[in-house]
Amino acid sequence: MSMNSFGHLFRVTTWGESHGTALGATVDGCPPGVAIDAGKIQHWLDKRKPGQNKYTTQRREADEVKILSGTFEGVTTGTPVQLMIENTDQRSKDYGDIKDKFRPGHADITYFQKYGVRDYRGGGRSSARETAARVAAGGLAREAIKSIAPGIDIKGYMTRMGAHEIDRSRFDWDQIDANPFWTPDAQAADEWASYLDGLRKSGSSVGAVIEVVARGVPAGLGAPIYAKLDTDLAAAMMSINAVKGVEIGEGMSAAMLTGELNADEISMGRDGPQYSSNHAGGILGGISTGQDIVVRFAVKPTSSILTTRKTITKSGEDTEIITKGRHDPCVGIRAVPVGEAMMACVLLDHLLLHRGQVGQNQGHIG
């Protein structure tokens, strides 16, 4: 299996399976001299790890990261950084009944069609467990960003669960870390709790929309035409398990606007150009404008549900299946820190590309 890496200069290769001994990431291209220790990465992994509340899978994983290489005396050396997370709470026996059946909505059937072999234990490589490695790499990327562009801040949050959307008039940044859904709307969090309780007890699931915002990003990141910043951000978010759609800025809604409404007007401010709005999501022509970078992605409902579903076996026979085991009723909850991590990795990658291409030279306005 190839294609387990992403990035240009800051390049991340993830490895491992859901029920294997361990999983992790090999990060190549991290600049030397970045102050790092396991605790700084652990902070972000703790946001993603399972079993923290009744709304996520009850699989209990500590997700403790170990840094195996690439650092010396608390700083990166410029050599590959190897990050490892051990799996400690696998229950592979839960999947014994489905080893010859394909789970509807999962990658079981496509992996088998492509490779002729399939790890049925929790989805193997296709499991969202793989995203723990991305979050670890993202933690490293955040520390590197601090040393290159210390004003950048990345924050993700849930804006929709199923048909229930937040009220943006109640948007409160301080609420995001105060509820189990990472949402800026406290009232929506209460409503979602009741809604998800019912779904969880019935054995069903629901999708979500996650928004990730990067503030303080300098103008000039990205390049035309095949190295656009939004191209790489879209690919990064789309690569996350269960993601079925990605938007930058106004996204699909831009198709419903007129040119007068969609184009962000520009005026000269005290510190440079300023914009009247941000329909572009902070990117024009594939290059950052200096405004907030706004990315949004849709996560489908978890396909592992306690409802009898029609499927087929490896031998081509029609059958039925119930997916037992421990699963997230809304996988979008734990996708929030994953989206943040992917944003961090892409931004660091483009900071390094920009520095390598133009150095400190940029067009000055005013």
UniProtKB/Swiss-Prot annotation:
Q: How is the cofactor bound?
A: Reduced FMN (FMNH(2)).
Q: Which GO terms describe its biological process?
A: amino acid biosynthetic process; aromatic amino acid family biosynthetic process; chorismate biosynthetic process
Provide the binding site for FMN. 125-127, 241-242, 285, 300-304, 326
Record-level GO cellular component terms: cytosol
| GO molecular function, a single term | FMN binding
What EC number(s) is this enzyme filed under? 4.2.3.5
Q: Name one Pfam family in it.
A: Chorismate_synt
Substrates-to-products reaction catalysed: 5-O-(1-carboxyvinyl)-3-phosphoshikimate = chorismate + phosphate
Keywords of the record, alphabetical order, are: Amino-acid biosynthesis, Aromatic amino acid biosynthesis, FAD, Flavoprotein, FMN, Lyase, NADP
Cited Gene3D superfamilies: Chorismate synthase AroC
Q: In which pathway does it act?
A: Metabolic intermediate biosynthesis; chorismate biosynthesis; chorismate from D-erythrose 4-phosphate and phosphoenolpyruvate: step 7/7
Q: What does this protein do?
A: This reaction introduces a second double bond into the aromatic ring system.
Family membership, please give it.
Answer: Belongs to the chorismate synthase family.
Q: What is this protein called?
A: Chorismate synthase
Protein's organism: Roseobacter denitrificans (strain ATCC 33942 / OCh 114)
